[in-house]
């Protein structure tokens, strides 16, 4: 299998989260690995969290399994059950359909780096957020009452 040259894959901190939910992830820099490498059956992202950055809002996926492998630094995993420190080599897994909102927060003074792996677009049927008035579907972001946010979702 060919080695991936990360320097050849665009790194971005774009988010589709509507304001004010977008602020916490401004220090999240990621590279989408699947499109430039030809992967079609799952998605993968190489993610760098700057100090104080969040990986996302606390969320779950209805149709997509998710796995994370910490490869540098450390971060705090926040889930419904509480907080857990993840360090190099630690793995976290969230089965699809389990409404256990999760995200990482980098509370250290150094960058942390992880790889996130999911089912990809064909399994992206939506999900929700534990702490805020936000749901996601393939075609956008919505309030829990069903009204649409004026924001472009970036899966």
Residues covered by each model-derived region:
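A short, N-terminal "cap"/entry segment at the start of jelly-roll beta-barrel domains
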Residues: 1-41, 127-155
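Conserved short histidine dyad/triad with adjacent acidic residue
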Residues: 30-32, 45-61, 99
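Active-site donor-binding loop signature of nucleotide-sugar glycosyltransferases
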Residues: 35, 51, 88, 119
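Ligand-binding loop in jelly-roll beta-barrel domains
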Residues: 38, 96-123
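Short, conserved beta-strand element in jelly-roll/cupin
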Residues: 46-50, 61-77, 117-120
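Short, charged/polar surface micro-motifs in flexible loops or helix N-caps
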Residues: 50-54, 74, 83, 98-99, ...
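Short hydrophobic/aromatic patches on the structural cores and recognition surfaces of FHA
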Residues: 73, 89, 104
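Short acidic-glycine-tyrosine-enriched beta hairpin
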Residues: 81-96
């Amino acid at each position: 299998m060919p080695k991936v040259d990360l320097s050849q894959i665009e790194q971005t901190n774009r988010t589709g989260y509507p304001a004010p939910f977008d602020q916490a992830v401004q220090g999240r820099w990621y590279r989408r690995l699947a499109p430039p490498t030809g992967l079609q059956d799952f998605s993968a992202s190489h993610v760098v969290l700057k100090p104080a950055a969040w990986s996302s809002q606390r969320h779950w996926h209805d149709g997509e399994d998710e796995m994370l492998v910490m490869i540098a630094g450390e971060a705090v995993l926040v889930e419904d059950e509480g907080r857990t420190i993840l360090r190099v080599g630690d793995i976290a897994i969230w089965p699809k359909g389990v409404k256990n909102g999760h995200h990482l927060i980098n509370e250290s003074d150094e960058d942390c780096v992880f790889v996130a792996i999911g089912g990809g677009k064909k399994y992206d049927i939506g999900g929700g957020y534990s702490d805020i008035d936000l749901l996601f579907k393939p075609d956008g972001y919505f309030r829990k009452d069903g009204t649409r946010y004026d924001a472009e979702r970036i899966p």
